[in-house]
């Protein structure tokens, strides 16, 4: 038996207490680390499905934007993402991607929800202000008529353009049918006809008919609304005029092309001939009456390959071959190629986003002035403005007098048609919109608004800050608070659509989305809306409305 002194017992007790404190501390730290690890694992386990849900919305949005079938998400995108992640970060991280729900039905539902969210955002933006509409009708691959409507409105200091809706039409598609569809949609959305400034359509009777057309129906509920005929469509109609001699050249040229292009054997033989002759092109282009720009491209290609075409037609004993040995015929072909190319350039300049009636009218007026100048030059035998014709006349001996007569008649008829479809209006009266600091009067403004315009033109603060404005609509919306009535008068001119370009462009997307392989697609409007809409979806809001479940 060992006997300890009082001092030794005191030291031993202190040592044991110290050891006990260390043990308790280590146990607490160990337990805390284990508990934190469990919490982290639980947190990761809980947040992973939520992230997978958000990812499924993002992928569905991209699929619709790319206008692809919904099955591509599960059959291609997900396997590709897993393969890339595995290669770069390993299987452990890549396995998390398998929890993203991307089945065909899931992607379809996500697109519908995203489209509905975009639709709600558009309605909220539009319903509180003035807006203009653009609408057109076309037939899809299943012969179903689709009415497509776009809206232009001001939001956050600038004009925006978005698809309002796309609806299938039944029956005869009369003006009453179009109005009932449009009016019903606006009532459901809570939009007021009193806020509709204008409607832009093509020139079909169902749209612009005075008695039973859409125009008559709309004016009965919105008498202040203005209707405009698509400027691009009017330009195409005005461009179709041709005097008999030139029309014969055009029709013969089309028949030449069809003789080669419509027969597969002839097409292959012509390609081989072009290769042997070292031509820059190996094929001709088809002409389509529906495609307005095709005439210029077809004739330009034929003119470039005229030697090859002449050789091919001669070998085939075609009756068309002798035309390509006629210098006057080729000269007329060269002129048609040049004038149609210039008309195509005008047509393309009228296309695009965020255009307005003022800028489009300026381009048409400029072309009309060019026609007048070209007619004067052609009368004097100067064809330098038509480069292909000018080069040909430099090389060949052609009866210029006969050619001048044909060209002058055509240019004069073009001028008449352009004046008919684009009557000289009061475009100059809107110079105050384009140049508010230099044009201080207008016949279009009341005396009171002219006084306000004088105040604005003298406001050097606004004049200095306006240099940073990107467009006319942004400038006039920026002065709405200080000069509300003048701003409204300007926006009443800038807000209306000048063409149905957006509808025509979106019909191309519709044909791509609802093709012969997806002709039974039932969510056409939703897919089309997501594909063309520029408004970002509120994915966080959509996710908050759902219970996150991982894919199994």
Regions found by a protein language model. Give the residues of each.
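Alpha-helical structural modules in large enzymes and assemblies
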Residues: 1-552
């Amino acid at each position: 038996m060992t006997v300890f002194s009082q001092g030794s017992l005191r030291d031993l007790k202190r040592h044991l207490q110290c050891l006990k404190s260390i043990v308790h501390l280590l146990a607490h730290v160990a337990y805390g680390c284990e508990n934190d690890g469990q919490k982290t694992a639980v947190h990761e386990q809980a947040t992973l499905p939520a992230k997978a849900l958000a990812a499924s919305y993002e992928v569905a949005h991209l699929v619709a934007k790319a206008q692809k079938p919904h099955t591509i998400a599960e059959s291609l995108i997900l396997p590709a993402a897993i393969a890339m992640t595995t290669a770069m970060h390993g299987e452990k991280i890549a396995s998390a991607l398998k929890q993203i729900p991307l089945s065909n039905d899931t992607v379809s539902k996500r697109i519908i929800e995203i489209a509905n969210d975009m639709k709600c955002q558009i309605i909220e933006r539009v319903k509180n202000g003035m807006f203009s509409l653009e609408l057109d009708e076309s037939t899809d691959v299943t012969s179903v008529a689709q009415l497509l409507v776009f809206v232009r409105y001001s939001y956050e200091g600038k004009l925006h353009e978005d698809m309002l809706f796309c609806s299938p039409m039944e029956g005869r598609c009369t003006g009453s049918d179009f109005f009932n569809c449009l009016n019903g949609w606006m009532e459901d959305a809570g939009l007021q006809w009193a806020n509709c400034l204008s409607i832009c359509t093509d020139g079909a009777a169902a749209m612009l008919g005075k008695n039973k057309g859409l125009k008559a129906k709309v004016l009965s509920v919105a008498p202040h609304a203005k209707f405009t005929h698509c400027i691009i469509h009017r330009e195409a109609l005005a461009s179709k005029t041709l005097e008999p001699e030139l029309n014969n050249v055009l029709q013969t040229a089309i028949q030449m092309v069809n003789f080669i292009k419509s027969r597969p054997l002839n097409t292959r033989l012509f390609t081989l001939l072009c290769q042997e002759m070292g031509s820059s092109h190996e094929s001709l282009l088809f002409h389509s009456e529906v495609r307005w720009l095709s005439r210029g491209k077809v004739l330009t290609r034929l003119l470039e390959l005229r030697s090859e075409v002449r050789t091919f037609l001669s070998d085939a004993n075609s009756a068309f071959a002798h035309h390509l040995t006629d210098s006057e015929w080729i000269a007329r072909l060269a002129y048609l190629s040049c004038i149609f190319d210039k008309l195509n350039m005008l047509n393309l300049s009228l296309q695009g986003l965020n255009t307005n009636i003022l800028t489009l009218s300026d381009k048409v007026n400029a072309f009309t002035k060019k026609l007048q100048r070209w007619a004067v030059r052609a009368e004097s035998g100067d064809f330098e403005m038509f480069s292909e014709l000018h080069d040909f006349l430099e090389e060949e001996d052609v009866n210029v007098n006969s050619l001048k007569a044909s060209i002058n008649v055509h240019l004069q008829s073009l001028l008449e048609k352009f004046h008919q479809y684009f009557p000289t209006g009061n475009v100059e009266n809107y110079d105050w919109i384009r140049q508010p600091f230099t044009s201080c009067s207008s016949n279009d403004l009341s005396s009171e608004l002219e006084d306000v315009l004088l105040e604005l033109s003298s406001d050097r603060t606004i004049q200095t800050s306006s240099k940073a404005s990107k467009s006319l609509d942004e400038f006039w919306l920026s002065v709405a608070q200080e000069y509300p009535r003048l701003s409204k008068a300007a926006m009443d001119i800038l807000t209306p659509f000048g063409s149905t370009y957006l509808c025509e462009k979106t019909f191309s997307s519709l044909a791509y989305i609802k093709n012969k392989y997806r002709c039974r697609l039932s969510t056409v409007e939703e897919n089309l809306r997501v594909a063309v809409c520029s408004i970002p979806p509120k994915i966080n809001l959509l996710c908050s409305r759902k219970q996150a479940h991982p894919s199994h």
